[in-house]
């Protein structure tokens, strides 16, 4: 059994978009919980800065500089991980881009495709290459990130909203296909969070009114635990916080 302070001891976790915002907070929290983290990001310098932080709380991370638009590079990831570790316990599909906030008729084909490639297609390709490794784990965990934008209520958020709606469907479909395995799939809607992407989308908003990424990371730790039973569900951070508070009061 794992020690309470290291609930992910001995687990191998891959986190995309790990160099900033929520992805960074998740990667650090997993390392602190005892996991070995494969941190995926676009720039080597930012990954090295993350590793400096991770080494203060856990073992050095494995750093992977990867452009998620490069499908052939993603496809080779599964075999590479298998050759070195033989399995994968946790996959967090966090990487995303906002794209243009513009009327749909004004979005260029290239801009549309860029957002879909990074936010949706990359997660499908990652699932495809990592699926055999997750099924070799005694408790494979997949956590994909959605957004309130996926509900289609926000004008001018077209590419991002569509990509996140696709992620929700992708997660639910994969969950259905993993029903009779040890893999559990969760889709997380973190809600408004104090990140650079949020600041870009809402420049007039006071960021101090929002939870920090480090506040949201415990939800991802909870879902990554081997004992987590959440499967095929959309988990909303604020609802999770409320449920945690209710459970604590009941004790």
Regions found by a protein language model. Give the residues of each.
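Conserved glycine-rich cofactor-binding loop
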Residues: 12, 19-20
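The beta1-alpha1 cofactor-binding region of Rossmann-like NAD(H)/NADP(H)-dependent oxidoreductases
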Residues: 45, 65-76, 109
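Conserved glycine-rich Rossmann-like NAD(P)H-binding loop of the short-chain dehydrogenase/reductase
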Residues: 33-49
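Catalytic loop of short-chain dehydrogenase/reductase
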Residues: 97, 135, 141-166, 171-180, ...
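Substrate-binding pocket helix/loop in short-chain dehydrogenase/reductase
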Residues: 102-104, 111-116
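Active-site loop of short-chain dehydrogenase/reductase
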Residues: 11, 59-60, 87-88, 134-147, ...
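C-terminal helical subdomain
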Residues: 180-183, 187-188, 195, 204-251
């Amino acid at each position: 059994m794992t020690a309470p302070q290291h609930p992910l001891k001995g687990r191998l976790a891959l986190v995309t978009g790990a160099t900033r915002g929520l992805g960074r907070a998740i990667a650090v929290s997993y390392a602190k919980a005892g996991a070995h983290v494969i941190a995926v990001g676009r720039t080597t310098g930012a990954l090295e800065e993350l590793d400096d932080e991770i080494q203060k709380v856990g073992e050095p991370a494995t750093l992977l500089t990867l452009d998620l638009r490069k499908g052939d590079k993603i496809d080779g990831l599964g075999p590479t991980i298998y050759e070195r570790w033989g399995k994968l316990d946790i996959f967090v599909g966090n990487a995303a881009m906002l794209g243009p906030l513009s009327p749909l008729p004004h979005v260029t084909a290239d801009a549309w495709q860029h957002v879909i490639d990074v936010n949706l297609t990359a997660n499908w390709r990652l699932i495809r290459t990592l699926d055999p490794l997750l099924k070799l784990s005694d408790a494979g965990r997949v956590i994909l990130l959605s957004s309130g934008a996926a509900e289609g209520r926000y004008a001018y958020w077209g590419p991002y909203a569509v990509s996140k709606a696709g992620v929700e469907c992708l997660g639910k479909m994969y969950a259905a296909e993993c029903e009779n395995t040890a893999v559990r799939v969760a889709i997380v809607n973190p809600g408004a969070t104090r990140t650079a992407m949020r600041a870009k989308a809402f420049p007039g908003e006071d960021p101090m009114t929002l939870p920090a990424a480090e506040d949201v990371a415990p939800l991802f730790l909870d879902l990554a635990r081997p004992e987590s039973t959440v499967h095929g569900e959309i988990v909303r951070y604020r609802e999770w916080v409320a449920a945690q508070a209710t459970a604590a009061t009941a004790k």
